[in-house]
């Protein structure tokens, strides 16, 4: 009987200790969760792309479904900042739009390449924004001279997105426009890519950024 009481007492003590330890660990986990902060730009980038998941555009085309990591390294820039970064900084620049089907088809693969290469910042310019700046024409002319945009027959600027640039010492050392994969039969540009197409995109972006 005495030994049974000892066993029960020991088990009770171990139970109390276990509860205390578990409680402490849960508190620390909650504290760590609360202290995690994600940049507003990363959250906005995720939202802007994912909010169109499964939605139809004005032509009835359905946007593919994306899952963007909330800790992505995106930093939004305006048109003037974009030109200044190209002229003066060492950096990587992504020019795109959430409504561009080719951009949506390749953005997850781009972010995977960025993660694999441990790239901590991607400057992001979203086209169709910043057209109301006072020096818009001057800025776009400079981008045209750098062959980042083109002027169409109707005198409107064309970006050829998605565009990926890497700059160093004020020079563009790598540039990718558009996509290089081919669509399969019955595959729409709005559809997600197959594994072979993803590999083509991955290798293209990896080679461009691994310099």
For the regions a language model picked out, list residue spans one by one.
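Typically the conserved alpha-helix immediately C-terminal to a functionally engaged Cys/Sec
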Residues: 102-117
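Non-catalytic, surface beta->alpha helical segment in thiol-disulfide oxidoreductase systems
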Residues: 154-211
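N-terminal leader/targeting and pre-domain segments
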Residues: 7-15, 21-88, 189-211
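Short active-site neighborhood of thiol/selenol oxidoreductases, capturing the structured segment around
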Residues: 84-100, 110
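C-type cytochrome heme c attachment motif
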Residues: 98-105, 162-165
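Loop/turn elements at helix/coil->beta-strand transitions in domains of secreted/extracellular proteins
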Residues: 88-92, 117-121, 161, 168-169
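Thiol-based oxidoreductase modules, predominantly thioredoxin-like and allied folds used
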Residues: 67-77, 95, 119-146
